[in-house]
Curated annotation (Swiss-Prot):
This is Homoserine O-acetyltransferase. HAMAP family: MetA_acyltransf. Its EC number is 2.3.1.31. The record marks 192 as: Important for substrate specificity. NCBIfam families: metA. It comes from Streptococcus thermophilus (strain CNRZ 1066).
Amino acid sequence: MPIKLDNKLPALDVLRSENVFIMDENRASSQDIRPMEVLILNLMPTKEVTETQLLRLLANTPLQINVEFLYMASHKSKNTHAEHMETFYKTFDEIKDKYYDGLIVTGAPVEQMPFEEVDYWQELTRVFDWSKKHVYSTLHLCWGAQAGLYYKHGVDKFPLSEKLSGIYKQTVDMPENFLMNGFDDSFVSPHSRYTEVTLEDIKNKTDLDVVASGQEVGLSILASKDLREVYSFGHFEYDRDTLAREYRRDLEVGINPDVPANYFPGDDPSQEPKLRWNLAASTFFSNWINYAVYQETPYRLEELEDDFSFYGYL
């Protein structure tokens, strides 16, 4: 099924060129079914790239989805034109009285900072608090997952000895979990981070299930039993060349990074990387939309206001 977007969003041209089924506002308004309402809190600096990555995956799901984008007004974006932000993004004050079936909180390149030192931290915590009564299921990605665990459950992050960057094997620990429907026993996906959370903290401070993990990546996917909280520390959404661009960016600023693991053929950065996680990515996002959101969300989203007591937040 298609994804519905603003007719003028630049990502539309890219997605249509890839034969992704997109429904514009005019066509969508003639359909008499309730689409899923999804809000994307995009914390990444390259916002248009992240938009396209996430929309590509959402468009592969079997449901019509209305997507809105949220940004943190307390942070000034340096890598995206103001006109783009004003046209396609909303502030928290503009959406705080609305309700959504799903919320996606992206990663952000701030993971080596204490959470409280991130300039939009207070605004982000307002979004987390608001989501209890206004969102059915929240999917937290990478730093967004760490931020959610820290604020909602008191689980802190810890520095790794070196950056984890590459394509890594992970094992499905809960094949009975709906998020893993259609997965093989193991899968690969990109990871790119300097920090991690520990299994001990997850067991001691939360009631979350470990859905997937890996020998090299540690925890990979966590979820509450009702799937209203989902945490993914990897980057299913990454393009074929995203890790390559990150690697070259780090080289240019003198970080001297290791070559991303299991990524370039023969570990040769001059070679084009192999895309090996596309099926897992599409399956994961389809499962989240279908099982965590569509199958359980109320038809009248306002009902979320009356039933949020089972959230395990602090």
